[in-house]
Regions:
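Expand to "…catalyze enediolate/carbanion chemistry for C-C bond making/breaking, isomerization
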Residues: 1-162
Length: 162
């Protein structure tokens, strides 16, 4: 509901046992008297806020259920957007959607190799008593290192060799 979205940080941080939160898109649309659009633009703000508040509370953000099971291209685009918005995963309503979610949320070989390069460059910089380094012309800093570690963690969780 609208109140749930407004209070999403309070909900996300209400208990140490809380693992994830997500948007009930249809409930939200109904409460807000919104018509569902093909691109779900009417719920973009709520999706952003839920993801932001989940991360602020230190828990996972699970993206909403995409209910048009026949629109595979729309679903794929929606999963990509959810990942871009910081979602940790996506709820599904049909078994045919699982493969796309796994494909798009599992790190690619290229992402894994890049993460390894970043961590190696950072470790080399630390060995040389320098906390600052670059790789391929890009500065490597703590947020990049944290992201690289996260990518490798996701890859391990997916059963990939890293």
């Amino acid at each position: 509901t609208a109140l749930g979205v407004v209070n999403s940080y309070k909900i996300a941080s209400a208990s140490k046992r809380m693992l994830a939160i997500g948007l009930g898109a249809e409930d939200f649309r109904t409460d807000m008297r919104m018509e569902r659009s093909e691109d779900a633009s009417e719920i973009l703000f709520a999706r952003n806020l839920i993801s932001l508040n989940a991360h602020a509370a230190g828990i996972m953000a699970m993206d909403y259920v995409y209910s048009n099971i026949k629109n595979t291209e729309g679903f794929r685009a929606d999963v990509k957007l959810g990942k871009q918005l910081g979602y940790t995963g996506k709820s599904v309503v049909h078994p045919n959607q699982i493969g796309v979610v796994h494909e798009l949320y599992t790190p690619t070989i290229k992402e894994i190799e890049s993460a390894k390069e970043i961590l190696n460059a950072y470790e080399d910089a630390l060995k040389n008593a320098s906390g600052v380094t670059s790789l391929n012309g890009k500065m490597i800093d703590k947020p990049m290192v944290t992201r690289a570690m996260s990518i490798l963690s996701y890859a391990k969780a997916a059963g990939m060799e890293v």
